Amino acid sequence: MKAAIHTSYGPPEVVRITEVGMPVATDDQLLVKIHATTVNRTDCGYRAAKPFILRFFTGLIRPKRTVLGTEFAGEVEAVGSNVTSFKVGDRVFGYIEGRFGAHAEYLTVPEDASVAIMPANVTFDEAAASTEGSHYALANIQAAKIRSGQDVLVNGATGAIGSAAVQLLKSLGAHVTAVCSTEYLPLVERLGADRVIDYRTADFTADEQTYDVVFDAAGKSSFGRCKRLLKPNGIYLSTDLGPFPQNPILALITPLFRGKKVLFPIPRHDQQMVARIKGLLESKAFKPLIDRRYPLDEIVDAYRYVETGQKIGNVVICLTGRTE
């Protein structure tokens, strides 16, 4: 089968398309024919081994897992003898951070992994693009216990995580202020934001409004810069480690004291998570944004584009010849 592999760490150019052996499902696995996957920031980080600490999990000198890809959607091609929840022909989607392997024509997935039957109202492209951004957004929203009527600011509202967060927060009844660049103001308003700040013309950290939660979905600000935006017991959330890395450290220290604090939740990857996302897709409370589509043969170009930092929502890799 065809797959995108990397046998060394580095820039997008370390990735190449080659033929590899077809995986075989064990008794407790399903074999999925991939129709769509994505290139996301997790793939970029593991490919480049940045931060360096990732090497302790992926291989100190060279990657142990050569095929990346965390999000997928496709059809079940075969099932192991012990599999009861899925059958051949099922349309499935899921998330496999840690296992990887979705940047290929076929993938084996344990029956109890983060995989579910696709909602009938989404395409393969949409299903593949629905998991990483929304599950990071959900993990943070749940950790902060955000509820109806609260004021929340989302920085990076056009990214995969930020665009999901805006939609999910509105479905909860929160009042959402979103931060994005000029050209995307109408888009973010359509996502449901009550108010939009154009970071090209205004510094959002100088905003006069205060918030119950500031969610830095872009990971480009800091608790220090955003602290003045928080109400007395407000919460700062970030999807990035921050320098040194400060955000996990602050998440350990700040809850020990009264007042404003930092939370840095570690998302759970299980069937409950993907089932929750399925429900959100079915209810139309969430729809992933898709920026560009590339065929597998052009995955290096997809990596380059993602690393410009200019993508909107998600970048999808199509394995069925469709890039429209």
For every predicted segment, state its role.
Residues 220-283, 318-324:
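Glycine-rich phosphate-binding loop and adjacent beta-alpha segment
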Residues 80-82, 176-187, 220-223, 242-245:
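Short glycine/proline-centered loop/turn elements that form peptide/ligand docking sites
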Residues 270-324:
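C-terminal hydrophobic helical "lid"/dimerization subdomain
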Residues 127-198:
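Mid-domain Rossmann-like dinucleotide-binding core that forms the NAD(H)/NADP(H) cofactor-binding site
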